[in-house]
Amino acid sequence: MAEQGKQGGKVPFGPDYVRAISPYIAGKPISEVAREFGLDEAGIVKLASNENPLGMPESAKHAAAAAIAELGRYPDSNGFELKAALSTKLGVPQDWLTLGNGSNDILELAAHALVTPGQSIVYAEYSFAVYALATQEIGARAIVVKARDYGHDLDAMAAAITSDTRLVFIANPNNPTGTFVPAAALETFLAKVPAEVVVVLDEAYNEYLDDDQQYDSVAWVRRYPNLLVSRTFSKAYGLAGLRIGYAVAQPELTDLLNRIRQPFNVNSVAQAAAVAALGDTAFLQRSAELNRAGKAQLVEAFSRLGLEFVASSGNFVLVRVGDDDDAGARVNVALLRQGVIVRPVGNYGMPRWLRVTIGLPDENAAFIAALERALK
């Protein structure tokens, strides 16, 4: 029973900074929308969670199926096979790698390992919700830097770093806006950051970059001991339901993350599927090509409808659907009633916008038709 306070009321459990957290709200699953609106699941289009519309590669399905036979045993806590595959692909030693239960796990591990209550974490306005969550859950102070053109203002972020800052989060491409920071600007920023401040470069959508945007962040890890690159298998690799990501950093950082991560944080099916997906370059190329075509399909429709949108380097597009602060919620409900799930972003301070995942051509077409009806 909770301790009674002097005035007879219960003393609340937990610290104030934990009770102040707004729980993360994920995109609605298809089954929930079907129940809520009386729809057939088979006809619902989900473009809310930036998943790969191709699903899992066949190679990963076969590897996952084979791994099921050993589910009576604990997974390899150190993830040797996956680390070996990543080590070969990236050209780094295995002790430069940490595996996570999705890249969300990596982001939170970094905050817990590197920041103490009262110290500060810097991140941009309109950036991934987990940055704020990771900051709040450890009692750190958030320094939120105003966005520039819906993306990162790196000069302002460098200037915002204080003597108690220990972590900076940067997503490239950024979620939910899709903006991209060129390599030269990132390198300039890294050179400005004090040695005691760790930069987490969140590259969840890295595989969707066009050829002229590609850069080698792993090479930067070799030069900057305070850089940690975070990546995931949830997006382009199609393994969102298996929850697996990884960090690349020098051993001084990965050692800290490995000290506090759960011993078996990545299950054996996820590890096996990730090894297979990592080697399936044909699937990755097909995913990127499909994404480029789908992005063009959405952009053409938004332009035709006279809707403002943010040029995206990810597998989603942010579109403004009205001029009033109820626009995003209103249009979202109208889409749900038609069996189309997208992501409202009012929780990011963008109530007039919706984020739309790029789907298969027929899914994109269904969304466009539903959007036109919703806007009438």
Curated annotation (Swiss-Prot):
Record PTM N6-(pyridoxal phosphate)lysine, positions in chain: 235
Gene3D superfamilies: Aspartate Aminotransferase, domain 1, Type I PLP-dependent aspartate aminotransferase-like (Major domain)
EC number: 2.6.1.9
CDD domains: AAT_like
Pathway: Amino-acid biosynthesis; L-histidine biosynthesis; L-histidine from 5-phospho-alpha-D-ribose 1-diphosphate: step 7/9
Enzyme kind, highest EC tier: transferase
Keywords: Amino-acid biosynthesis, Aminotransferase, Histidine biosynthesis, Pyridoxal phosphate, Transferase
Record-linked Pfam families: Aminotran_1_2
One example of a Gene Ontology biological process annotation: L-histidine biosynthetic process
GO MF: histidinol-phosphate transaminase activity; pyridoxal phosphate binding
Keyword Amino-acid biosynthesis: yes
Cofactor entry: pyridoxal 5'-phosphate
Catalytic activity: L-histidinol phosphate + 2-oxoglutarate = 3-(imidazol-4-yl)-2-oxopropyl phosphate + L-glutamate
Oligomer and partners: Homodimer.
Family, as annotated: Belongs to the class-II pyridoxal-phosphate-dependent aminotransferase family. Histidinol-phosphate aminotransferase subfamily.
Protein name: Histidinol-phosphate aminotransferase 1
